[in-house]
């Protein structure tokens, strides 16, 4: 199941959170959901060159808050903040309420799955070999701290007549483990031969759930009697740890002296 299902949806309410955080009645839900889709489509086209990895939409009382996670925040803000003000006005026309835009910088874009997929798509559109682009992205991700990465490309690769799928993996990518922090991203490359789809899975390590506590191993009790690691022998009917008498030891000599 972990191989086919969406990694983020599979881990919702366990280790991942929703991309839209608001509550609406059944009457207004479809309208607000449609507005969210319009906002995401608009930002995808408007900020295609700004390396935006994730968009979080929140709706407090009678306003909206949009958080952009970008590797190039200066491109989003623009000169003297002109671009960000124009962005707010356009978003307010779509949503119909005042919009606040927050920008969070992505410190390591090389291990962000969405940004990796977008980077590979841009390289494919520039006629770079898909294997070279995929392997270079994997090397950069592993070098900057990712514990595993998997990249899949599908379509008419290198202009082949028959579409096919190729994927590469390096490190661990445990898709069935719910506590695994799996970042997932998808992108499309519009080439002269057709559309090529890119999927990226990045494993950033295991994380604890909301109700989990770290398990601390209790130290083992020291057995100070006898040698360390030596098996204990109760000696049959005697006291625990006492060896039975053998021929030639002290007990045998005492019995011989008594008989004399």
Swiss-Prot record:
InterPro entries: KH_dom (IPR004087), KH_dom-like_a/b (IPR015946), KH_dom_type_2 (IPR004044), KH_sf_prok-type (IPR009019), Ribosomal_S3_C_sf (IPR036419), Ribosomal_uS3_bac-typ (IPR005704), Ribosomal_uS3_C (IPR001351), Ribosomal_uS3_CS (IPR018280)
Listed name of the protein: Small ribosomal subunit protein uS3
Pfam family, one: KH_2
Family per record: Belongs to the universal ribosomal protein uS3 family.
Keywords, sorted A to Z: Ribonucleoprotein, Ribosomal protein, RNA-binding, rRNA-binding
Subunit structure: Part of the 30S ribosomal subunit. Forms a tight complex with proteins S10 and S14.
GO MF terms held by the record: mRNA binding; rRNA binding; structural constituent of ribosome
Functional summary from the UniProt entry: Binds the lower part of the 30S subunit head. Binds mRNA in the 70S ribosome, positioning it for translation.
Annotated stretches, region: Disordered: 214-260
Entry keyword annotation includes RNA-binding: yes
Keyword match Ribosomal protein: yes
Record field: compositional bias (Basic and acidic residues): 234-260
Entries under CDD domains matching the protein: KH-II_30S_S3 (cd02412)
One Gene Ontology cellular component: cytosolic small ribosomal subunit
Gene name per UniProt: rpsC
Biological process according to GO: translation
Species name: Azoarcus sp. (strain BH72)
KH type-2 domain ranges (all copies): 39-107
